[in-house]
Amino acid sequence: MPQMAPLLWLNLFLMFSATFVMFIVLNYFIKVPSKIEKSSSQLQKMEMTWKW
């Protein structure tokens, strides 16, 4: 069985690395961020009256 030359291994590694990086970059940029609606009920401030 013939063995692969070191340059072929390097070429194979570079191709897989480039494919992996492109996959990660596309997954990062393809998602559209969803807008979070601010509701005033979540931002209510609790006030405590202290009786000393």
Swiss-Prot record:
GO molecular function: proton transmembrane transporter activity
One Pfam family named in its UniProt record: ATP-synt_8
Keywords: ATP synthesis, CF(0), Hydrogen ion transport, Ion transport, Membrane, Mitochondrion, Transmembrane, Transmembrane helix, Transport
Segments traversing the membrane: 6-26
Entry's localization field: Mitochondrion membrane
Membrane topology: Single-pass membrane protein
GO terms classed as biological process: proton motive force-driven ATP synthesis
Any GO CC annotation of this UniProt entry: proton-transporting ATP synthase complex
Tree of life domain: Eukaryota
Tagged with keyword Transmembrane helix: yes
Role of this protein: Mitochondrial membrane ATP synthase (F(1)F(0) ATP synthase or Complex V) produces ATP from ADP in the presence of a proton gradient across the membrane which is generated by electron transport complexes of the respiratory chain. F-type ATPases consist of two structural domains, F(1) - containing the extramembraneous catalytic core and F(0) - containing the membrane proton channel, linked together by a central stalk and a peripheral stalk. During catalysis, ATP synthesis in the catalytic domain of F(1) is coupled via a rotary mechanism of the central stalk subunits to proton translocation.
Subunit structure comment from the entry: F-type ATPases have 2 components, CF(1) - the catalytic core - and CF(0) - the membrane proton channel.
Similarity comment: Belongs to the ATPase protein 8 family.
The protein, known as: ATP synthase protein 8
Organism: Penaeus monodon (Giant tiger prawn)
Protein's gene: MT-ATP8
